[in-house]
């Protein structure tokens, strides 16, 4: 792999900071966007300074200043955006980035902020969670209308949110005595170590096999059921949990009285664990789809048994 100039937008976020690290480790000239408001957050600012110590370049720009964005993207070959999808307004900020990339005319690859379920497959998703997918599709359309070279990354379930707590609603720590199994617990799900997500993302930036395609992260040993995840934890911890199966109807009933953010989470879990939206389709090269672990077999990805060890 050669040396690229990579700009990460959202580099202080949950997945963004890992992508910055992976880019540096892979020897790329790494640039991190520094937005004015970042200087008001001591933790984010210190994180940016730590990137600088590791060799990254900090580039000042603002979504409210088009010319600053154009100057930033003119510095690089690749732009990776990882702004949070938790706030829908943040996703549409990417439209400003698309305009800057279009004007600059030099970017060879743009990876927008997705990294979860494939929004192209979620047109019938439940409200209010559907809004996230709809907005991601708005960004995709803008990218494609502008003929910007791109890769969409479907990274499925981050371990920190879905594995450590055995996908339970509430705390991010493992349950100590009881666990709710969604449905019969036998729907296949894809769980990912976040650092592996970053590694696969960086490996794709110069790969023509992923150009203008959707890359799914579906390493075979991480395609397991909810019940298998729970059983893995039980074997590691030596603690047998009391299991209660929850029907789809009862699960959806949990939405009642919840705030919007909680409803979004419940809706997304429903699609993952009851409908099997991460695995109920084949990856089809004819539809410009590729799978990461097949493209990069040299990556020693983290299995969920190993991911769970830190929780013991």
From Swiss-Prot:
Signal peptide: none annotated. It is an enzyme of class 1 (oxidoreductase). Expressed in seeds and roots, but not in stems. Detected in leaves. GO terms for molecular function: lariciresinol reductase activity; pinoresinol reductase activity. The active site is at 136 (proton acceptor). NADP(+) binds at residues 10-16, 35, 44, 140. It comes from the Eukaryota. Substrate binds at residue 268. Gene3D superfamilies: NAD(P)-binding Rossmann-like Domain (3.40.50.720), UDP-galactose 4-epimerase, domain 1 (3.90.25.10). Its EC number is 1.23.1.4, 1.23.1.3. It holds the Pfam family NmrA. Keywords: NADP, Oxidoreductase. It catalyses: (-)-lariciresinol + NADP(+) = (-)-pinoresinol + NADPH + H(+); (+)-secoisolariciresinol + NADP(+) = (-)-lariciresinol + NADPH + H(+). GO terms for biological process: (+)-secoisolariciresinol biosynthetic process; (-)-lariciresinol biosynthetic process; (-)-lariciresinol catabolic process; (-)-pinoresinol catabolic process; lignan biosynthetic process. Belongs to the NmrA-type oxidoreductase family. Isoflavone reductase subfamily. Reductase involved in lignan biosynthesis. Catalyzes the enantioselective conversion of (-)-pinoresinol into (-)-lariciresinol and of (-)-lariciresinol into (+)-secoisolariciresinol. Abstracts the 4R-hydride from the NADPH cofactor during catalysis. Dimer. This is Bifunctional pinoresinol-lariciresinol reductase 1. It comes from Linum usitatissimum.
């Amino acid at each position: 792999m050669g040396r690229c100039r990579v700009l990460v937008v959202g580099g202080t976020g949950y997945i963004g900071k890992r992508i910055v690290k992976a880019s540096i480790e892979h020897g790329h000239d790494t640039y991190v966007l520094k937005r004015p408001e970042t200087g008001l957050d001591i933790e984010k600012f210190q994180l940016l300074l730590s990137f600088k110590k590791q060799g990254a370049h900090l580039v000042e720009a603002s979504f409210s200043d088009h010319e600053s964005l154009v100057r930033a993207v003119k510095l690089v070959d690749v732009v990776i955006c990882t702004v949070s999808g938790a706030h829908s307004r943040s996703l549409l900020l990417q439209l400003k980035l698309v305009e800057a990339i279009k004007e600059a005319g030099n970017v060879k690859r743009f990876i927008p902020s997705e990294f979860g379920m494939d929004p192209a497959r979620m047109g019938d998703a439940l409200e209010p969670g559907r809004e996230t997918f709809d907005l991601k599709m708005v960004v995709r359309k803008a990218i494609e209308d502008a003929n910007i070279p791109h890769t969409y990354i479907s990274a499925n379930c981050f371990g920190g949110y879905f594995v450590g707590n055995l996908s339970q609603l509430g705390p991010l720590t493992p349950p100590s005595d009881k666990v709710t199994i969604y449905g019969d617990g036998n729907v296949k799900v894809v769980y990912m170590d976040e650092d592996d997500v970053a590694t696969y993302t960086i490996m794709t930036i110069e790969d023509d096999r992923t150009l203008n395609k959707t890359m799914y992260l579906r390493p075979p040993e991480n395609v397991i059921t909810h019940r298998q995840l729970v059983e893995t934890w039980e074997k590691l911890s030596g603690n047998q949990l009391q299991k209660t199966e929850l029907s789809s109807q009862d699960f959806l009933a949990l939405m009642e009285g919840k705030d919007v953010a909680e409803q979004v989470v419940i809706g997304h879990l429903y699609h993952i664990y009851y409908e099997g939206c991460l695995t109920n389709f084949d990856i089809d090269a004819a539809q410009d789809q590729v799978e990461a672990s097949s493209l990069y077999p040299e990556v020693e990805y983290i299995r969920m048994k190993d991911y769970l060890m830190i929780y013991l």
